[in-house]
Swiss-Prot record:
Species, as recorded: Solanum lycopersicum
Protein name: Non-specific lipid-transfer protein 1
Homology family: Belongs to the plant LTP family.
Secretion signal, residue range per the UniProt entry: 1-23
Disulfide bonds: 27-73, 37-50, 51-96, 71-110
One Gene Ontology term of the molecular function aspect: lipid binding
Length: 114
């Protein structure tokens, strides 16, 4: 239950910090869409609906600004949420059979995302 509270607070924080533009992708959308990945990334459950969330996110990230927002949010989440297996996070594109134009990692330079 404590983890759910942390995730809810993180999503709320992202929604406040990243002011939405006209139909621009928000950090709240990124974290909400990828919430099904959390049990898998923490070694507490199967992949489940994670790939569907990843594919929806990719479909929503239509512009360079959207992709940079997604990258920044993923990077922040990787740093903020305890117990994430960073190797599993980096492997999500391969497991879900999608192409993400950057590595999912706390060390990713999101300013280079196109």
């Amino acid at each position: 239950m404590e983890m759910v509270s942390k995730i809810a607070c993180f999503v709320l924080l992202c929604m406040v910090v990243v002011a939405p533009h006209a139909e621009a992708l928000t950090c709240g959308q990124v974290t909400a869409g990828l919430a099904p990945c959390l049990p898998y990334l923490q070694g507490r459950g199967p992949l489940g609906g994670c790939c569907g969330g990843v594919k929806n996110l990719l479909g929503s990230a239509k512009t360079t600004a959207d992709r940079k927002t997604a990258c920044t949010c993923l990077k922040s989440a990787a740093n903020a949420i305890k117990g994430i297996d960073l190797n599993k996070a980096a492997g999500i594109p391969s497991v879900c059979k999608v192409n993400i134009p950057y590595k999912i990692s706390p060390s990713t330079d999101c300013s280079t995302v196109q």
